[in-house]
């Protein structure tokens, strides 16, 4: 049985020490994340989805999120760029991307999951994409990225709600105020979510 992988918001503004909303310790994850992705095997991996936190200045300024965090991940800027190139993956592993405008990748209607390599695979509506994964026998999703207590937490919540088992490698995520062990203990007691080293 194959697993699926979601890489949450591994973007410059979060991962780099001089990013607009740098997550403490995230810069140290870049090398291990690249090595981990490079080591995925196509026989065991149904695909990898890269999420992109994506903002437009005028819209962001009026958002709830702007009350808590400074502007970050403005589309088309260096801070929006993914620090993990899909070329790291075995070519036989499908690579996908989704742009979201809020913490929760499940909250917005109409989001499309698109090919991350430019291979001209047609976009797929988000919910239909995950339905297809389940129909194909995918039961477990591994989630890595930042921030553990925001966008990673919401990614996990949506997966659990859709019946997936979730695994979060603790060494491949960092939080802002809470780390993943605390997030899972406080927010997902009894859920099908585990951390691994």
Q: Locations of the language-model features?
A:
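Extreme N-terminal starter segment of soluble prokaryotic enzymes
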Residues: 1-5
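Generic enzyme active-site microenvironment
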Residues: 6-7, 11, 51, 98, ...
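Short, glycine/acidic-enriched loop or turn micro-motifs at the edges of active sites
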Residues: 12, 56, 148, 174
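Acidic/histidine-rich helix-loop elements
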Residues: 15-25
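Active-site alpha/beta core segments
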Residues: 31-140
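Histidine-anchored nucleotide/phosphate-binding helix
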Residues: 33-40, 150-161
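Short acidic-hydrophobic, aromatic-tinged amphipathic segments that line or gate anion-handling sites
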Residues: 98, 190-197
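A short glycine-rich beta-strand->turn/loop micro-motif centered on a GG-aromatic cluster
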Residues: 142-145, 164-178
């Amino acid at each position: 049985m194959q697993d699926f992988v979601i890489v949450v918001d591994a973007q410059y503004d979060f991962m780099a020490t001089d990013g607009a909303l740098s997550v403490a310790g995230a810069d140290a994850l870049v090398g291990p994340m690249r090595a981990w992705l490079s080591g995925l095997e196509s026989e065991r991996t149904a695909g990898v989805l890269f999420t992109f936190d994506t903002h437009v200045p005028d819209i962001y300024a009026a958002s709830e999120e702007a009350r808590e965090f400074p502007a970050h991940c403005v589309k088309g800027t260096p801070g929006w760029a993914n620090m993990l190139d899909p070329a790291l993956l075995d070519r036989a592993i499908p690579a996908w991307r989704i742009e979201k405008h809020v913490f929760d990748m499940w909250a917005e209607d109409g989001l499309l999951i698109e090919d991350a390599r430019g291979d001209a695979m047609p976009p797929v509506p988000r919910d239909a994409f995950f339905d297809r994964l389940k129909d194909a026998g995918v039961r477990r999703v591994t989630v890595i990225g930042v921030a553990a207590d925001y966008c990673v937490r919401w990614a996990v919540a949506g997966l659990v709600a859709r019946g997936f088992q979730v695994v979060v490698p603790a060494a491949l995520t960092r939080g802002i105020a809470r780390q993943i062990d605390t997030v899972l203990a406080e927010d997902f007691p009894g859920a099908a979510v585990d951390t691994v080293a």
